[in-house]
Amino acid sequence: MKPVVLTFLALVMSARAVATQRPPASATRPPFTIVVNNANPVDTLTVAELRRIFMKQQRLWAHGDTIVPVDWDAASQMRRVFSQIILSRSVREMAEYWVQQSVTQGLAPPSTLSSGVAVARFVATVPGAIAYLPPDAADRSVKRVRIDGLPVFPAQSR
């Protein structure tokens, strides 16, 4: 009986030690970075706010500017990942959402661009713009925004 209890305690302690270890920085890095125009005072957004913004349920920034979300082309991997993680929908489900919004609310989907350079250039020149970029594509022409509530992602193998 005593060896069973000791084995159980050892397992519990090992599990606790593993659970309290922080994952390496690469494991927590999201597959995209949210960016806004440098003049935008926003520093942090929640996943729920991003969802409302990219589904055009929130159309104004707190400081009064119109929000201009920019998406990637529907065929891009960036768009698929962003849609799944932030919008909790596939690209196809989002296309269906926009058909419904167009008919019932008169809303058009966000504009789409096909490259990180084009997305960054657009965000840098449009005051209310918001978009997502690969983490290494966000340069000083745009402002990175912290995402509160984003889940931890495993490191990607290269």
Name each model-derived stretch.
Residues 21-158:
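Exported/periplasmic ABC-transporter solute-binding proteins
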Residues 5-14:
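Bacterial N-terminal signal peptides
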Residues 16-19:
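Sec/Tat signal peptide C-region and signal peptidase I cleavage site
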